[in-house]
Amino acid sequence: MSESLIIFSREWLVTTSLTAYLVPVYFRPVTSVYDMTELTRYLRTQPRSPVVLGLRPHEHVTDLYRLQPLLAGRAVLFVSRSFYWTDYSLPEWLGLEQFGFCSWDTIHNPFSRRREMRRFKQSAADVQEDDCATDGAKRQAPAASVITGMQILERANRWLYRELSAAGLNGFEVRVLSLMSEGLKGSLSSRTRSLYKNTGLLKLGMTKHVLNLYRGVKVRPELQAGLHCPDGESRRKVKESGMDEVEILHK
């Protein structure tokens, strides 16, 4: 029997909306998960099940790092309104092999949604074929680690820094982006600094918008959000409103 698609987001409304969108087009069992304990349990008991995560990796580095033993060896799809270079890069650092990204615009469009799910199902099937040598039942849950959340972020940032050069940035662009992401200017003139910043961001697939510099070059402690769903009160209010979850998400 094939294992189900697991859907999870730290926001209950996002989880239910993703479920409403994907159930009609996935054509296989779908399991909606609403808290970290439940997510860990399903990842452990269904080691080959594909996972849809309604989040951006750069905002959940610590939790994803600790979940890495359970996320590795399966297809993972990240869904959000937008992504940054950090988001596209971090799954590789986390040791994920089959992963993808999908915007809400894609999810909202029926044609692109079906196309994305076909692609994702094929990716999941490829993973399951390649994973025959691994006994998923023996895969362990994330162990409590002595490494702190700050140390995890530091490790991620050291890796991201090295990846800037691998992405094609020259030494000046790497230096300028690193300094400016810390709010520093360095000794270059304003015009030269702006030039290297813009060309560096362009090589990373981002525009010169300041938000890309803030979120897209390194991971930050102040942007980290724990993977915990809101309390049952917000969930109850949505049900009592009588509105469809997908409708609310559009508001």
Task: Tell me what each language-model feature is.
Residues M1-A144:
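N-terminal regulatory/sensing modules of transcriptional regulators
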Residues S2-I6, P24, L43-V51, R74, ...:
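Solvent-exposed, well-ordered amphipathic alpha-helical segments
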Residues A20, P24, R41, P69, ...:
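Charged/polar, solvent-exposed surface patches and flexible loops
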Residues L39, A156, L160, V210-V217:
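Generic structural signal of hydrophobic/aromatic residues within well-ordered alpha-helices
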Residues C132-A141, V146-R162, L223-K237:
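Phosphate/pyrophosphate-recognition segments in soluble nucleotide-handling domains
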Residues V146-N198, L202-L204:
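Helix-turn-helix DNA-binding segment
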Residues N198-K251:
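Basic, Lys/Arg-enriched C-terminal extension of HTH/homeodomain DNA-binding domains
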